[in-house]
Amino acid sequence: MANSIRLEIVTPERLFYDNRVELVIVRTLTGDEGFMANHAWACKLLDVGEIWIQEAGSKDFKIGAISGGFIDVKTEITIFTDAAEWPNEIDVERSKSHKEKAENWLKTHTRADADETEILRAKVSLNKALTRMHVAAGGARRKR
């Protein structure tokens, strides 16, 4: 347990995760980053993406989907996010529907007839849907 750290993932609806981990990998605004015990203090914004959790004493990773937020790394790691889901909680058909809706909207709207905020919302919606679909299928990354 000397090389583990407590990870807590909090959403507005629930405490999504609370356990000791050896490694957590998240997508920050500058790319994927891993955090472990004895990591330097950090507070970073998170992008929509997969979260990979290696629990203490395990070689395997638990994979989930998060919808952005921020990570605070001190003597413990805390992630605050609007939504977090495990693969078995994801409604794949709903994700496919959101993906198609966002893709269709982006195909039919241009910068000339939609403002940047609307375009950004559609892109974020598409990214969330794709992330959820990847997580439901076991994650986009290869096993480590």
Describe the residue ranges of each PLM region.
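Compact, glycine-rich, soluble single-domain proteins
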Residues: 6-8, 12-97, 101-103
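Acidic/glycine-rich phosphate/pyrophosphate-binding loops and surrounding catalytic core
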Residues: 85-144
